[in-house]
UniProtKB/Swiss-Prot annotation:
<dbReference type="GO" id="GO:0050661">
    <property type="term" value="F:NADP binding"/>
</dbReference>
<dbReference type="GO" id="GO:0070403">
    <property type="term" value="F:NAD+ binding"/>
</dbReference>
<feature type="binding site">
    <location>
        <begin position="14"/>
        <end position="43"/>
    </location>
    <ligand>
        <name>NADP(+)</name>
    </ligand>
</feature>
<dbReference type="GO" id="GO:0005737">
    <property type="term" value="C:cytoplasm"/>
</dbReference>
<dbReference type="GO" id="GO:0008977">
    <property type="term" value="F:prephenate dehydrogenase (NAD+) activity"/>
</dbReference>
<feature type="domain" description="Prephenate/arogenate dehydrogenase">
    <location>
        <begin position="14"/>
        <end position="297"/>
    </location>
</feature>
<dbReference type="InterPro" id="IPR012385">
    <property type="entry name" value="Prephenate_DH_fun"/>
</dbReference>
<keyword id="KW-0560">Oxidoreductase</keyword>
<dbReference type="Pfam" id="PF03446">
    <property type="entry name" value="NAD_binding_2"/>
</dbReference>
<dbReference type="GO" id="GO:0006570">
    <property type="term" value="P:tyrosine metabolic process"/>
</dbReference>
<dbReference type="InterPro" id="IPR006115">
    <property type="entry name" value="6PGDH_NADP-bd"/>
</dbReference>
<comment type="pathway">
    <text>Amino-acid biosynthesis; L-tyrosine biosynthesis; (4-hydroxyphenyl)pyruvate from prephenate (NADP(+) route): step 1/1.</text>
</comment>
<comment type="similarity">
    <text>Belongs to the prephenate/arogenate dehydrogenase family.</text>
</comment>
<dbReference type="InterPro" id="IPR008927">
    <property type="entry name" value="6-PGluconate_DH-like_C_sf"/>
</dbReference>
<dbReference type="InterPro" id="IPR003099">
    <property type="entry name" value="Prephen_DH"/>
</dbReference>
<dbReference type="GO" id="GO:0004665">
    <property type="term" value="F:prephenate dehydrogenase (NADP+) activity"/>
</dbReference>
<keyword id="KW-0028">Amino-acid biosynthesis</keyword>
Length: 452
């Protein structure tokens, strides 16, 4: 345990450097300076004059480039896109101060570690981090992975832990290999699902929440719409980095497209028993040991909707039952890949807990899975939409297999542009929904601890 006197001494003498002032870099810069650390930052050199004016009143110091950050900093954090990490470390890494500590914030650590090992001076320690949440989420209580990859100086690890303590996150210690496997297991399939959903809606040019109570109405639909739009309100590289640079993610995204295709084939071939057997096996594998409360309940699911319609003012019109192919394919993928999503809850992002929650709800709410299978076989109201969804899932799988950031960016931004007019409202509702769901899941965890 580091003494308070030691931490105060570090704050008075040490400098934290941040290369890259995107959303997460800025979050770290503000959190660290608010906690009393000296922070020096830079972004791309051509933005210097603009950012100097923008952050004139900020507590951190802004300099022109990463060379100036690297020469002065005792802990350097590269907060840059995964696609650029190697190039940027190659440029600024050799300027690192003697004996400094270096880390990064990318969502896939293999290329980051490779860049550090290749371009950093041998006297640098490598202790890297990953906050498993977005910049709009409160850092308190969220998972923060710390990877002590190379430490020659005993105080280095204690120092990084002391710096990160101001985030009030749950610190999790992993190797970079463990980190990459876990992030793929918890994010690759679920991101593919909601990217494909948004892509399918954009292709058929509909905002699903505007169609009244007939289609895409109700609790599960609220979450699907809100999460899909939340993903498309972020920057494309947030998801591209994980999907393209993480080898484990490739297999999982391919499996998601395969699961969606195979389940859809069973639906259109009217193979009800085969579909039922397959989904019950998936249910047993993923949820067989589940006890206690569900992560989500009806009250939360019904509360947050973009739709202006309601059952009460629509002549008692009932929503058309949905096949929920996108959610069925998530659970089937976990089953086919042998992934137990509950194994990684300590490293789960806020969005992953919601993905797991809606999947849990669909498979464990009494009668709902059976109703969903019945709708998939006997009610063809969603068949055209499901076909478009399968095409979108396969497209995303192909984009990832090409490992081309430009193609990924183009695909993502074309869908983003379609939803752009709706994103501000969706973000407001989505933020409230996420806050409520995370609070509910914390309450559930506390209740289960009391009962054990």
């Amino acid at each position: 345990m580091v003494s308070e006197d030691k931490i105060e001494q570090w704050k008075a003498t040490k400098v934290i450097g941040i290369i890259g002032l995107g959303d997460m870099g800025l979050l770290y810069a503000n959190k660290f300076t608010d906690a009393g650390w000296g922070v020096i930052c830079c972004d791309r050199e051509e933005y210097y004059d603009e950012l100097k004016e923008k952050y004139a009143s900020a507590k951190f110091e802004l300099v022109k480039n990463g060379h100036l950050v690297s020469r002065q900093s005792d802990y350097i954090i590269y907060s840059v896109e995964a696609s650029n990490i190697s190039k940027i470390v190659a440029t600024y890494g050799p300027s690192s101060k003697v004996g400094t500590i270096v880390g990064g914030q990318t969502s896939c650590k293999l290329p980051e570690i490779e860049a550090f090992e290749k371009y950093l001076p041998k006297d640098c320690d490598i202790i890297t981090v990953h906050s498993l949440h977005g910049p709009k989420v409160n850092t308190e209580g969220q998972p923060l992975v710390i990877i002590n990859h190379r430490s020659q100086y005993p105080e280095s690890f204690e120092f990084v832990n002391s710096v990160m303590a101001c985030l009030k996150s749950k610190q999790v210690y992993l190797t970079y290999e463990e980190h990459d496997k876990i992030t793929a297991d918890t994010q690759a399939v679920t991101h593919a699902a909601f990217l494909s959903m948004g892509s399918a809606w954009a292709k058929i040019k509909i905002y699903p929440w505007t169609l009244g109570v007939n289609k895409w109405y109700g609790g599960l639909e609220n979450v699907k719409v809100n999460i899909s739009l939340r993903i498309y309100s972020n920057k494309w590289h947030v998801y591209a980095g994980l999907a393209i640079t993480n080898p484990s993610a490739h297999q999982q995204i391919l499996q998601y497209a395969t699961s969606a295709t195979e389940l859809f084939s069973l639906m259109i071939d009217n193979k009800e028993q085969e579909l039922t057997d397959r989904l019950l096996k998936a249910k047993q594998f993923v949820f067989g040991k589940h006890t206690g409360l569900l992560l989500l309940d009806d009250t939360i699911l019904e509360k947050y909707s973009l739709s202006k319609s309601s059952i009460g003012n629509s002549n008692n019109c009932k929503p058309v039952p949905n096949s929920h192919l996108s959610l069925l394919a998530i659970v089937d993928s976990w089953f086919q890949l042998g992934i137990d999503p509950y194994d990684h809850m300590i490293c789960s992002t806020p969005l992953f807990r919601i993905f797991l929650g809606v999947s849990e709800y669909l498979f464990l709410k009494p009668g709902l899975l059976e109703q969903t299978i019945d709708a998939a076989i006997h009610d063809k109201s969603f068949i055209k939409d499901d076909l478009e969804f399968v095409i979108s899932a396969r497209e995303w799988s192909s984009v990832v297999s090409f490992a081309n950031f430009d193609i990924y960016k183009k695909q993502f931004q074309s869908v983003q542009k379609f939803f752009e007019p709706m994103l501000p409202e969706a973000n407001l509702i989505g933020n409230e929904m996420i806050k409520t769901i995370l609070s509910h899941s914390s309450d559930r965890s506390a209740a289960e601890k009391r009962n054990t």
